[in-house]
């Protein structure tokens, strides 16, 4: 299941700001860049985009499957997300594509907890 629209980062002008001035944290397979949302925006929900380059896998089918699994992991954590953040999740090359969704969930939860975007562990 895909992320709800309110949790998707779709504004193209926000991406350069995340690359330039976003704070960064990483794990062996994921990189998170995040920024607080601008005060101009009245969006309360935290929004995320997932980037998977050709370096991860050349086949779009595999990249899309990976994207869906990351979205599923984000969906499980959505109730614990603090509002007001824009995040960009980048999958690093060399990731084992057969990693289970529960491992993604654990790694993503660790990353978001360190970034203080979610409320503590469950």
From Swiss-Prot:
A cellular-component GO term for this protein: ribonuclease P complex
Enzyme class: hydrolase
Species the sequence originates in: Synechococcus elongatus (strain ATCC 33912 / PCC 7942 / FACHB-805) (Anacystis nidulans R2)
Gene3D superfamilies xref list: 3.30.230.10
HAMAP family per UniProt: RNase_P (MF_00227)
Protein name: Ribonuclease P protein component
Function summary: RNaseP catalyzes the removal of the 5'-leader sequence from pre-tRNA to produce the mature 5'-terminus. It can also cleave other RNA substrates such as 4.5S RNA. The protein component plays an auxiliary but essential role in vivo by binding to the 5'-leader sequence and broadening the substrate specificity of the ribozyme.
EC number: 3.1.26.5
Quaternary context: Consists of a catalytic RNA component (M1 or rnpB) and a protein subunit.
Family: Belongs to the RnpA family.
Keyword terms of this UniProt record: Endonuclease, Hydrolase, Nuclease, RNA-binding, tRNA processing
